[in-house]
């Protein structure tokens, strides 16, 4: 379960509030890049929420390897989206400079957690949505909320599955996230 969120986007919206087409164009390009990156790693794009993205990895797999391949795919997607996002920002920065003298600083934060979730269509008779639910989803979102711009944070369950395939650095331990699953 993977969440991305743009750090500094609310301030960007405030700075460029008179130029909504610039914001919409940037967001469209970012979301398109995120979707392509997720799909390239066999992920499922769960949803866009404001400037955030939620993706699932392993939904379509049998889980024979206890989520190892899917956890690696999620981390690879995060690693691929980070420079892709930076490229999109650099291109739009040229446009934004024409409309504001303020320095604009935004970055992408990401949180990844591996765990089981209830997956399916949720909603009403007139509108439903394919999504994932449960404590592991909430935990992944909370991890993402802790990520600084440019940072990819993974839970211990994800780290245990990817450590042999992905070089990682220790960012420290976060122990005060409420409702930690398991």
Segments the model singles out, each with a brief description of its role:
Residues 21, 69, 128-131, 152-153, ...:
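Catalytic cores and conserved motifs of cyclic dinucleotide signaling enzymes
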Residues 41-49, 82-111, 181:
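Catalytic core regions of nucleotide second-messenger enzymes
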Residues 33, 78-81, 85, 140:
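Cytosolic nucleotide-binding catalytic cores of signal-transduction proteins
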Residues 67-71, 75, 100-102, 109, ...:
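Catalytic-core segments of nucleotide cyclases and related cyclic-nucleotide turnover enzymes
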Residues 7, 116-117, 138, 157:
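Alpha-helix/helix-capping structural signal
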Residues 1-76:
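Catalytic NTP-binding/metal-coordinating core of nucleotidyl cyclase/transferase enzymes
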Residues 117, 146-182:
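Cytosolic regulatory/linker segments at or just downstream of nucleotide-handling modules
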Residues 12, 56, 120-121, 161-162:
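Residues that scaffold the ATP/ADP-binding catalytic core of kinase and kinase-like folds
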């Amino acid at each position: 379960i993977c969440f991305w969120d743009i750090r500094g986007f609310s301030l960007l919206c405030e700075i460029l509030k008179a130029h909504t087409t610039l914001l919409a164009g940037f967001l469209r390009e970012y979301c398109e890049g995120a979707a392509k990156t997720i799909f390239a790693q066999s992920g499922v794009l769960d949803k866009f929420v404001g400037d955030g993205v939620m993706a699932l990895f392993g939904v379509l797999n049998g889980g024979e390897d206890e989520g190892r391949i899917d956890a690696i795919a999620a981390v690879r997607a995060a690693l691929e989206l980070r420079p892709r996002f930076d490229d999109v920002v650099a291109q739009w920065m040229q446009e934004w400079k024409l409309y504001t003298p303020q320095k604009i600083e935004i970055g992408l934060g990401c949180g990844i957690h591996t765990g089981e979730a209830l997956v399916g269509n949720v909603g009403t008779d007139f509108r439903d949505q394919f999504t994932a639910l449960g404590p592991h989803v909430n935990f992944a979102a909370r991890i993402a909320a802790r990520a600084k711009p440019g940072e990819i944070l993974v839970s211990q369950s994800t780290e245990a599955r990817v450590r042999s395939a992905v070089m990682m650095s220790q960012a420290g331990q976060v122990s005060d996230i409420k409702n930690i699953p398991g």
